[in-house]
């Protein structure tokens, strides 16, 4: 999968959910919604290389409600 497409998927996932997402949540959302399998570390490498996206990601260990409760349409 090309990097630019993955970056746009990450942006879309961050915009779609109102609560903060961790890198693990973003990977789960993308794999479920796009029915793709992502290599280990692919989301982290995208986030670390893009400061705009990295700032939006939750870096705490806070427990949030399940993703299905957070979906905003």
Curated annotation (Swiss-Prot):
This is Uncharacterized protein I73R. Induction: Expressed in the early phase of the viral replicative cycle. Belongs to the asfivirus I73R family. Keywords: Early protein, Virion. It is found in: Virion. GO terms for cellular component: virion component. It comes from the Viruses.
